[in-house]
């Protein structure tokens, strides 16, 4: 068994699956573009919290990427239905640290920061992918604990006003209240909040996708996702929810199009784009294409994060994998809400590209 296959099969073999020179694009209009996307020499991506923790997963060197696993220690890592990343990038002598998403509970996030030796208050910026509680859940507690500890002017970057709207999940069996992130409370605790609906550079080394264009015909927002309408004219009124143009009363539930969801990305020198979808409600392929358009760069080194395909029918999974083949990233690192169905499809169709992350996994891209 070659080294690549050894790493790819690590989590599968142990019985655990994580559910974790450049060319320019020359076609298609770009609504907004980063004129000179920053390049990093090295990028270290740590899954601080993910849906599973696989103590037996294998690590090692895989071509241009190093995969490091966290063994059992005195402070065991906690996994939950949530996602949080610590991102450490460098260019020359400049280092930047970014916190991306904040899991569901503060006890898992704080425990894992401690176990992994991460100081969250050393972060240069915070990025929130969207307004679901399994991504923002621990942010209020982190903001409270960080008063007086953050770097001056540290900012939370969100993709749109709907990040701070009340969300609900409605299924035939139950209704789940996702709650609402309190923006004024974050600001009162010393965090600035900045909305980036257009592609934007973060801390000089990262960048966000901006609002994600819906290009594919097979990627649709989850049917169960709802937003609770706010007062007319407010940031959470139904007319602000993207494709929704309906008359509603405050308190009504309307379809959630995830207008404010955004992806986070890096351009690794001589490798290409590393694109982190977080949850992928807008579509993992749409997210990748959005970053390609925003940067004008075609080459994708890695696609990382939750792809939100666990509940997807086989046809959608097959079309997603076919689109991955066309994009041809060097690596695919599915996490969080991707689903075993999609992980196995990638393993079957693109085995040489699959790396299985879980809670505590560190992946080093570049030098």
Explain the meaning of each model-derived region.
Residues 44-49, 98-101, 206-212, 273-279:
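Active-site-proximal beta-strand elements of phosphoester/diester hydrolases
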Residues 160-188:
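Active-site neighborhood of divalent metal-dependent phosphoester bond hydrolases
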Residues 106-157, 295-304:
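Active-site metal-binding motif and surrounding structural segment of the metallo-beta-lactamase
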Residues 1, 21-44:
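C-terminal segment of N-terminal export signals and the immediately downstream linker at the start
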Residues 51-54, 59-116, 257, 261-276:
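Conserved beta-strand hairpin/beta-sheet module of binuclear metal-dependent hydrolase folds
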Residues 125, 132-136, 155, 241-361:
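Cap/insert and terminal regions of metallo-dependent hydrolase folds
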Residues 1-14:
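N-terminal secretory signal peptides and thylakoid transit peptides that target proteins
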Residues 201-266:
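Active-site-proximal loop/helix segment associated with metal-binding centers of metalloenzymes
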């Amino acid at each position: 068994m070659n080294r690549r296959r050894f790493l790819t099969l690590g989590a599968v073999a142990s019985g655990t699956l994580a559910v974790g020179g450049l060319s320019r694009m020359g076609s298609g209009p770009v609504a907004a573009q980063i004129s000179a996307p920053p390049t990093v020499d090295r990028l270290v991506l740590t899954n601080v919290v993910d849906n599973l923790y696989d103590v037996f997963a294998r690590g090692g060197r895989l071509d241009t990427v190093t995969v490091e696993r966290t063994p059992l220690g005195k402070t065991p890592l906690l996994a939950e239905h949530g996602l949080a990343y610590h991102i450490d990038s460098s260019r020359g002598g400049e280092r930047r640290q970014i916190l991306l998403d904040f899991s569901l509970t503060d006890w898992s996030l704080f425990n894992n920061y401690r176990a992994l030796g991460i100081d969250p208050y050393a972060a240069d910026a915070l990025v929130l992918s969207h307004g679901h509680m399994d991504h923002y859940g621990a942010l209020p507690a982190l903001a409270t604990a960080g008063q007086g500890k953050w770097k001056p002017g540290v900012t939370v970057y969100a993709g749109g006003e709907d990040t701070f709207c009340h969300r609900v999940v409605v299924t035939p069996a139950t209704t789940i209240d996702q709650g609402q992130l309190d923006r004024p409370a974050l600001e009162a605790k010393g965090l600035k909040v900045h909305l980036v609906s257009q592609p934007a550079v973060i801390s000089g080394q990262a960048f966000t996708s901006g609002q994600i264009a819906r290009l594919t015909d097979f990627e649709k927002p989850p049917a169960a996702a709802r937003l609770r309408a706010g007062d007319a004219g407010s940031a959470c009124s139904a007319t602000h929810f993207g494709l929704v143009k309906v008359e509603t009363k405050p308190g009504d539930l309307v379809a959630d199009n995830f207008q404010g969801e955004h992806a986070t990305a890096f351009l690794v020198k001589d490798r290409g784009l590393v694109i982190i979808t977080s949850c992928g409600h807008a579509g993992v392929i749409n997210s990748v294409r959005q970053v390609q358009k925003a940067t004008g760069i075609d080459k994708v080194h890695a696609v990382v994060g939750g792809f939100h395909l666990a509940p997807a029918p086989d046809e959608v999974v097959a079309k997603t994998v076919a689109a991955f083949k066309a994009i041809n990233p060097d690596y695919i690192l599915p996490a969080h809400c991707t689903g075993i169905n999609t992980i196995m499809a990638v393993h079957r169709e693109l085995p040489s590209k699959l790396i299985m992350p879980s809670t505590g996994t560190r992946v080093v891209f570049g030098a």
